[in-house]
Amino acid sequence: MLVDSAPGMTVVGEAGTGREAVERARSCRADLVVMDIRMPDLDGIEATRRIAADDDLAGVRVLVLTTYDTDEHVVEALRAGASGFLVKDTRPADLLDGIRTVAAGDALLSPGPTARLIARALRAPAVPAADGALPAALDRLSGRERQVLALVARGLNNAEIAAALSLSPLTAKTHVSRIMGKLAARDRAQLVILAYESGLITPGANGAP
């Protein structure tokens, strides 16, 4: 099996349904769950939501798989708590890199398909947070932090953000960490969703998708 053959990786469980995936995540103490969005019994979105909401599974990351990068259900998976996605025909080496990226605590985002997908899905009005909670949270960000968040939302990594804003990579990383703390975001994937839903970034504006 591909994952078992990779250094430092071990498959600790497999599941045929979303409900089984949640149960296996609990019983096997997995570090990461590779989740198919379309599964019987309980779809991958709801399974991801349950894993993210389970205090006993804190720290378990979810990487979702989809057949097409136009599958807008991926956005719902990111909202539910997934840390990224890959299409099923991804090259084996890229799949392993993606697993390593998410397992290390980063979100699997890129300026390409992920940003385009999120932008398309969020063109429809999102359900606003109660009492304008998201915009109010953004008020706690400094001007520089808003700039950094906007670049995160476009899929830039810390090194790219540093280059764009003439910062050191460490400073860029520190800004991202502070933003995540202020917005109570799990990871960069959630920061992307928050940036679009709050209106900080709009599709097609200033180079956004």
What are these regions (language model features)?
Residues C28-V34:
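Active-site beta3 strand of CheY-like receiver
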Residues G155-Q190:
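Recognition helix of helix-turn-helix DNA-binding domains
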